[in-house]
């Protein structure tokens, strides 16, 4: 038995160098989840690594490097096909609909056909290596129709798990998607389909019923976790310790509010900034005592809705600092770039409060990462009730992220919260993060599929 993890992309980027190719590990929710299990569970990873033109000899070198260095199998996709599937269908059509942002979506058959071809290439690569008794673990919305393809193409006897890292919307939202039946039918050929919450599982089942798709799969809710030890270990590294000192000195005497998000419209960053503005209007006594640091990691910038989102954020940042700031004092910093892991952990550690105000969000692991870095500070988590993490972290200060007044009041509540209450809330959330780890998540998925996997896959 072998476990084959299948995702849209390998957790690597590759670029040409003088001596061949350079490989850089990437981050993200799935990567964070699976990196935590790599020393406990044996698996190989299959995913797209292309995006540039490569000749056959270069592909051969990359295949060898990926297997020997990362125990991974690269899938090579033509750049135009990749763009039409990833940007055109996945992120301009499927992503907004599954997060209930359906109004500006226009279905195009060209992009859907690219999605089908993309999944077909994955299917062909998997069929080359899958054997009787194996487990194929398919991840996320980029590969929703892959399970059905595998069942139809392969004559091998293997099990399929599917995990959706995003939301799954109510059936009436899915009704707006022209290919909805193909999508849910594709998923329904899995042995196990797992979601972050039971609400998403119920929505999937309702959509199948509405479209007369038979579901023989086992449906479950298994929220993903992180490896908290990885973050706490980074806090002890000299680079992180020094950066924490620098940040504390830089913002001495001020409460630090933090946001860390991809620049994605589902994350609700403009609503967060407007909530922060409203807080400053209602409580001017805090004007000289707070600073808001917002990290916006660039995401899907080739999709129009995402690039215009950054423009909107820059306008709001300028508006906030013009209205409330001065030559000596800036209230809102917006960093539109990725930060390295040590910098991220330092930001988590020094912040008095993290704002997660997603309008819709499958999970949001940033909330869990923040908790894992707050054992000394007992910072407060302001969390959207529309994020899947709200079911995992019961002691967060929960807000309706569509309501800027509620965000403003939540900020005030967090800033003025007593040390006793902060400590109590943090301890409840810490226990949740330490209990529902990425290893626990993977084990629960595998346990839901079969009983004998430990004998073959545990390291």
Swiss-Prot record:
The keyword Ion transport does not apply. Its main location: cytoplasm. One of its GO terms (biological process) is trehalose biosynthetic process. Its EC number is 2.4.1.15. D-glucose 6-phosphate binds at residues 86, 140, 300. It is an enzyme of class 2 (transferase). CDD domains: GT20_TPS. GO terms for molecular function: alpha,alpha-trehalose-phosphate synthase (UDP-forming) activity; trehalose-phosphatase activity. Belongs to the glycosyltransferase 20 family. Keywords: Cytoplasm, Glycosyltransferase, Stress response, Transferase. Synthase catalytic subunit of the trehalose synthase complex that catalyzes the production of trehalose from glucose-6-phosphate and UDP-alpha-D-glucose in a two step process. Can function independently of the complex. One of its GO terms (cellular component) is cytosol. UDP binds at residues 262, 267, 365-369. It is found in: Cytoplasm. UDP-alpha-D-glucose binds at residues 262, 267, 361-369. This is Alpha,alpha-trehalose-phosphate synthase [UDP-forming]. It comes from Encephalitozoon cuniculi (strain GB-M1) (Microsporidian parasite). Pfam families: Glyco_transf_20 (PF00982). It comes from the Eukaryota. InterPro entries: Glyco_trans_20 (IPR001830). Component of the trehalose synthase complex. It catalyses: D-glucose 6-phosphate + UDP-alpha-D-glucose = alpha,alpha-trehalose 6-phosphate + UDP + H(+).
